[in-house]
Amino acid sequence: MPEGDSVLQLSNRLQFMAGREVTGCSVRVPRYATVHLDGMVCERVWPYGKHLFMQFDQTIVHTHLKMEGTWAIHYAGDRWRKPGHTARIVLQLANAPRDIEVVGHQLGFVEIYPADQYHQRIAHLGPDILDPDWDREEALRRLNNRPQRAIGAALLDQKVVAGIGNEYRAEACFLAGVHPATPVSEVDTARILDISRRIMWANRTSPVRVTTGVRLSLIHI
């Protein structure tokens, strides 16, 4: 499953959507099959943990890749690289000389709701570990809230901190010299949280993950 750095990079690739008008829309999820975004303008695209958000006027499209989801970008009319039956959202955006299509394939989660519900919808999530202004103290409080829980399970819990997945959990525990099954109460949670943040921050713009070596030595783990 993609982790927070992958979703951040995806969001960065989709920034071209901002300011473009939707010229065609198909939501292939039964609950939202009648939703039409045509004529709306994409206000912004952003990540939160492993979740991706797109705002069109006062409507938010909220998706999660889960295990197999992807977003494809191509010119309208071009042949898709994946089968049509895997598409969950098809967005056509204004562009000259040819419109652009953005297609979400095999998305594991799709919700569409009014923009004023955004904070309510993400209230269950912990602080986003890749937010430049992330709330470290709140994440630490949540991490310490269940002292008998295994540290590995706690780091994976998106209600504790949003964005960490299995690969970064394993690497953070390894770099901290801690077995993932160790109870939270027996771990220097501030240190392991800081390691998690640092290795993810170091990889936030890189297509190839590196968790040891020169790059990380520059951030003083």
Residue ranges and their predicted role:
Residues M1-I219:
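Structured catalytic/nucleic-acid-binding cores of DNA maintenance enzymes
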